[in-house]
Amino acid sequence: VFAGFRGLLDKQVPIERQQQALVRLKKYTGQAEGYEPLTELAKLRLTERSEIPGLIKPFAGEVQQDLERSPIMIEGLQGVFEATELEGYQEDLDLLKVQLTAYNSWVEETILPNTRYSAALPRELYELQLKNYGVDDSPEALIRTGQVGFMNIRNEMMALAPLVAQQKSYDTSDYREVIKRLKTEQVHGDELMASYRETMRELDFIIGREGLVSLPDEPARVRMATAAETAQQPAAHIDIPRLVCNTGEFPEFIVPKI
């Protein structure tokens, strides 16, 4: 729900298209004629599926994580709407927030006690998920590839660690200790944004100098994520605009709020 509204109400989306968020709100809350509240439909669907014998139950860790992040994203809906020029959304938005909060309580009381505590999937489902991502190798082949890749990266870290230790004046060159100490020197807030922008300017210069690819006329866009966006995706990523009917919307790099 949060991701859908955030995409629709992006500042690059024309106001005429953003108006559809008001229609969507009424449909989600069941206020539109012929529609039931989205949360009630979700309850019915989950209840229906849980009664099927032999069906794999959801993983407890995933459900718990969703329950912890949901309140942040529910509150984040307010900021998404407030950042637009839309009017007349508050009553329906308040209702949606109440419905989503009640739904979370229902999940905690009804679904969470009936979850599985092992994240492992049956082999068939695991292979199916791999194929959905275009991976045809067997799990055993992937394990071998991963082990070789890990050893290669470890060897590179062992070679680089002494150089980093010398530059940072560390009293150890063990790559594990070097990584631990680097993690204590994280950059936060405005300093992080400044670092990202400076690095992107350097990358743009190198790409242009070497003629690697064509670049847009304007600099790359980067911004700090909101608390709700960070809860949804707590890692740096690129927000790709729609490919169909794009009216000049640009991709934007999103930096998590840490």
Where are these regions (language model features)?
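N-terminal maturation segment of proteins
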Residues: 1-258
